[in-house]
Amino acid sequence: ETFRELTEYYCGGSASGEENRTAGGGEERLHAIRGIAYRRSGPGREDEICRTPERELTDLSALPFLYDDPGPFENKIIYYESSRGCPFRCSYCLSSIDKKVRLRDIDTVKKELQFFLDHKINQVKFTDRTFNCDHEHAKEIWRYLAEHDNGVTNFHFEIAADILTEEELNILAGLRPGLVQLEIGVQTVNEETLREIRRPSDIDKIRRVVGRIGEAHNIHVHLDLIAGQPFEGYESLGKSFDVVYSMKPEQLQLGFLKVLKGSPMHERAQGYGIKYTSRPPYEVLCTSWLSFEEICRLKRIEEVVELYYNSNQFTHTLPVLEKS
């Protein structure tokens, strides 16, 4: 409970410490470490929590590469980041607090990607918040993967479809089938909700881009929706679902809002009537627009989507059901 309390206390602010140190010698040593929260010791001070000043952000290129031995990761997904941060301000995301984007040195990235290619890792998932927010960075990585493709490894990227350029679309169209898969967060098509969560989106362009990518038949596309957002009730979410479903992605994920501590959404949750679980993942239970019963119904719909759509086992049945 103490660890949980301190973690929640620290995450309630704009914490961004990335280095780890071992401290010994009592409270004075702890106070000298920037970017931590700890409970003071001593008579009458057990309930006092101290938080030290923020530390400077670490150079992303200085972080060590952790996958020098591929053995433990055989037949497993490897997670990798070439950038950290996001220029956008989506209110449910912690990256909205600080809009800085830091890039790992591109030569270092290429060297590390080559390691994955040389060892024929099955899948590498980039954890970059919006991989293509820096267009030159994205293009250089996609070109490198195309030129050094081993015919085995798949790379997963989370992108913003409505900022893809014509040049980027042409690069993607020329990739080996299965080399890349793209996850695109549509989240909602409700304009009022998009404005409230500070997520400007061109839904028409997203639709065109997804269709364009689909024409090449070489990239697995995964589209996301989020239930439980402000101003989106059950009927509105149904409209969002219909729009995304009509884009015919390979995977359609119906997710549920997570009210992350420290995010703008957390600060405004009470005003939205949002109730959520008190422990991680802090998932929405109801809102002023969506009842608990409707959330439960959406959970069942999520299971149906996984079973009948995402399993890809009902490709002949679903078109018939859609007409009925």
Regions found by a protein language model. Give the residues of each.
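Glycine-rich beta-alpha loop elements in corrinoid/cobalamin-binding modules
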Residues: E1-E54
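N-terminal [4Fe-4S]-dependent radical SAM core
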Residues: I33, A37-S82
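Conserved C-terminal portion of the radical SAM core fold
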Residues: K110, Q114-T127, V152-E158, L172, ...
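Radical SAM enzyme core and accessory elements
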Residues: S14-G25, S41-R45, C86, R300-S324
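Conserved residues at the C-terminal ends of beta-strands
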Residues: E1, R39, S96, T127, ...
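Radical SAM [4Fe-4S] cluster-binding motif and immediate context
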Residues: F65-E215
